[in-house]
Amino acid sequence: KKAGVPVVPGAVVKAEKDIDKAVKKIGLPLIAKPDNGVGAAATFKLETPEDVDHFKAEWDGHTEYFFEKFVTSSEICTFDGLVDRDGNIVFSTTFDYAYTPLDLMLYKMDNSYYVLKEMDQKLRQYGEAIVKAFGMKERFFHIEFFREGDDYIAIEYNNRPAGGFTIDVYNYAHSFDLYRGYAALVAGEPFPDSEFEPLYCLATSRRANAAYALSEEEVLAKYQHQFRVKKEMPAAFAELQGDYLYMLTTPSREEL
């Protein structure tokens, strides 16, 4: 908010007495999520007083939660990147989620997201303003936004890369090694530039126990020229996001 970026009202819940205060302040429906967490794990959507009572019954009473107004938009995008020791952004990119993290958790969908070749200027302006306001140095950042028409609403700011294998997705999209780039930055060396035009990079998952119209072999044969790598998801992410992650690149939005 201090950065001049649209946000939804929210409140931190540390004790049971804070719950009713937060509900009264923000109003239903709202989202309750751990103040320190990844994705939509342990997240609750509270629409009715009964939902609030259910949260009270399920909550361990110790984990701090953040309550925020529910936004109806189903479009979530990011402003991600890396800042150097002076706080200057040396790398930035953006990706769109095919499904919201909350829908992934509620409906056990297959996780899919894609890095874009170009970034909307307003999203870039908002993201850069947020990074400047936090004043972090020599860190990755991962900022999520709801897209509302031609505007954006900031959801959360993280002093880390996006989860899972997302750095690998960035690398395939931008044709360089962000791991080496970060090491160079920490060592005081110049951050390397990519010599190639960015590509779209799709990361999409499959579940081991789900039935699909096409087998893995058929999918990989169909997209053999776009396919880059298959990763086995760590157990911590598999239940929420799927067991296997596939990365594919293309220069064409239509093909994506």
Where do the PLM segments sit?
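Short, flexible turn/loop "capping" segments at secondary-structure junctions
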Residues: P34-N36, L104, F237-G242
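Peripheral (often C-terminal) accessory segments that flank ATP-dependent C-N-forming ligase machineries
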Residues: I19, G181-L256
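Phosphate-binding core of ATP-grasp and ATP-grasp-like enzymes
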Residues: E58-E64, F70-Y113, Q121-I153, N158-I167, ...
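ATP-dependent carboxylate-activation loops
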Residues: R160-G181
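Short secondary-structure junctions
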Residues: V5, G135-M136, K222-H225
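Active-site nucleotide/adenylate-binding loops and adjacent lid/helix of ATP-dependent enzymes
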Residues: K2-S73, D84-N88, Y113-Q125, A129
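A short, glycine/Asx- and small/polar-enriched loop/turn
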Residues: I26-G27, R147-I153, L240-G242
